């Protein structure tokens, strides 16, 4: 395990979500009602950065072609509108362990 510091817990609590650079990766992190989540922030379809967090459904939508991902598992729930027959089971995103360590959000990469 290699825990990497990202942003302050206060900043994430205020923003609710953020795309952060960790080494050579961009990771989407979120704080939903005190629960922390982390997954790849680059859509597996066209390499766009994910953006729209739905706190109620725990999903994240890609801004480019509207693919929808489960924040907990990284599974693609809805394919991009430009590729409705895309194999959802093959286009999921990697999730990461995440923690609050003394006021800093850390991701295990």
Swiss-Prot record:
Entry-linked Gene3D superfamilies? Rieske [2Fe-2S] iron-sulphur domain
Q: How is the cofactor bound?
A: Binds 1 [2Fe-2S] cluster per subunit.
- The chain positions of domain Rieske read 3-107
Residues recorded as binding [2Fe-2S] cluster, renumbered to this chain, are 43, 45, 62, 65
Q: Which Pfam families match?
A: Rieske
InterPro entries, alphabetically? Rieske_2Fe-2S (IPR017941), Rieske_2Fe-2S_sf (IPR036922), SDX-like (IPR053457)
> What PANTHER family does its record include?
FERREDOXIN-RELATED, SULREDOXIN-RELATED
Protein function: Not yet known.
Q: Oligomeric state and partners?
A: Homooligomeric.
User: What is the protein's given name?
Assistant: Sulredoxin
What organism does the UniProt record list as the source?
Sulfurisphaera tokodaii (strain DSM 16993 / JCM 10545 / NBRC 100140 / 7) (Sulfolobus tokodaii)
